Amino acid sequence: MERYEVMRDIGSGNFGVAKLVRDVATNHLFAVKFIERGLKIDEHVQREIMNHRSLKHPNIIRFKEVVLTPTHLAIVMEYAAGGELFERICNAGRFSEDEARFFFQQLISGVSYCHSMQVCHRDLKLENTLLDGSVTPRLKICDFGYSKSSVLHSQPKSTVGTPAYIAPEVLSRKEYDGKVADVWSCGVTLYVMLVGAYPFEDPDDPRNFRKTITRILSVQYSIPDYVRVSADCRHLLSRIFVGNPEQRITIPEIKNHPWFLKNLPIEMTDEYQRSMQLADMNTPSQSLEEVMAIIQEARKPGDAMKLAGAGQVACLGSMDLDDIDDIDDIDIENSGDFVCAL
């Protein structure tokens, strides 16, 4: 890590701590996730690194490299100076339909690319979408800790993700198509941008987790009268929030929907995306062999010394619902509750 100068803490969570660093040679800023060496370097960490490494797209946080320190495995990635889309919604209350579409187009562009690379994210939510620092913000999908690749891994069966965003079929604990479940989560993100609340929470009892699950399973949602939403937008949401995953709208169908196509920036078109991907193929990246060797070495316990002064963030990541014995015992503050009440 000699080439990087630590600037400040930018977050913490179940994984460890994240810091903003500066490349002393280029002055470029990066975000680094530090994970303690030893037992914490498990299959989930390896999966996150391998899936993230394979993805190169303008709407996905760019993976740079993994580095080993005496105490930690460091994952170096692009730094998004604009913060979370979640924070932007908290500050705004809700977005206009045009602003929601602007970010939704970018979200779908990134998710479509992930799926084309045979990677399903499985934890799409506002907190896992960052913004760069530009005046016209570019959305960046991050956090591939729960992602699965159909090339590297079996079809998902575990119930992972943030409760408010989980698709009905994921709650069934049977094998499901992670790509189709991602579509549902994108719909929840769109709804929250438009309304400023989660679609399946009871407005009179938003912290009742059991009730939220029941409403998800029965696809019980509505758009409040005070929110003006076009007929095309309502139609798209009604095609996303379909309990039967086989009947749910697909990503290619979303990309052809009239609401999605309205004011679509040229950089969101398939032709432009393909040209960008061809250019990215020539971008050098850390070799697979080097990455795997570093991960294997990181499984060995490091020195007892710990990084000092971990920062704090409001959202500490998602939970795995398979680890929950009684949903009444859940701390709703950290389970996807929309903490910015309107």
UniProtKB/Swiss-Prot annotation:
Keywords: Abscisic acid signaling pathway, ATP-binding, Kinase, Nucleotide-binding, Phosphoprotein, Serine/threonine-protein kinase, Stress response, Transferase. Activated by phosphorylation in response to hyperosmotic stress within 5 minutes. It catalyses: L-seryl-[protein] + ATP = O-phospho-L-seryl-[protein] + ADP + H(+); L-threonyl-[protein] + ATP = O-phospho-L-threonyl-[protein] + ADP + H(+). Residues 4-260 form the Protein kinase domain. GO terms for biological process: abscisic acid-activated signaling pathway. SUPFAM superfamilies: Protein kinase-like (PK-like). One of its GO terms (molecular function) is ATP binding. Its EC number is 2.7.11.1. The C-terminal region is necessary for the kinase activation in response to hyperosmotic stress. PANTHER family: SERINE/THREONINE KINASE, SERINE_THREONINE-PROTEIN KINASE SRK2C. Belongs to the protein kinase superfamily. Ser/Thr protein kinase family. May play a role in signal transduction of hyperosmotic response. This is Serine/threonine-protein kinase SAPK1. It comes from Oryza sativa subsp. japonica.
